[in-house]
């Protein structure tokens, strides 16, 4: 009897594994994990060339991991076990105070060589663009840097100030930098970043928008009147959650609804709408894509104030939630994601003849963005 009880956990485990394997065998391959928010490796095609150079073996290993029976459940189970053992860092994500999930950044993400190349390209592009436009640069700090007091005790983390010092030194002569670190730091006790996602919230974006308005000499009273949001979701689980399939508290998504009648053209005529929001994404695991329907190559937005100004915004996903604020302040707003568009910075200046330019990136994403180095050099 004792032997039976000793073997029981192993028997149960094998039964569960075989059951999951059987279920998976009867189902189709998955191409996307809504939990991890990423594409999954499907069964790779075999060829002699791919076997000899090792590409097939590498992809097949990824295929086995990604198509493992009940993968989403195992990711969650692994996280629970590591938490039970007292770990506070899982898959480069810290379990922080007040239920914040904070990414562990290192010099891998802030590679000095890539940063140097990107800053060189940024300085060169700003120098050209300033000849015909009013140019500003805004780098948004990571959540882990602004909320570093919420990190576990003695948790190692990248000292992001090194990046800002290099940025300041490179752009000091140009006088184009809008530093949002101080204002975000001043409001860090407010919900300026999502708990389960690496992006800032609409509130965090609004504080940055207020700083931008001050820098360009805009209507500050009008900008402050936009600090009114509507909650559209209370069950948002973001990218950081997806890495470990764990969260103690869901996020809410709030939006600013423009008083102006906007007209939005997607990707040079691919689609036309009257809003910067795609509410269909609220029914999916990728709720953050409610902002502009995800990252688009080009957005052309009109319907704002009639002042003859065109703002060219070169950005990453952090800018998606600031667009509704900016759209009202310009006769035309052109939004470009260089990661999605095979066009150089010089060509953008020729195509849209902007009167104003804002380059807005999250610091970690800018540090890793090789597309910026290539297209703005």
Predicted stretch roles:
Residues 1-377:
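Extracellular glycan-modifying ectodomains
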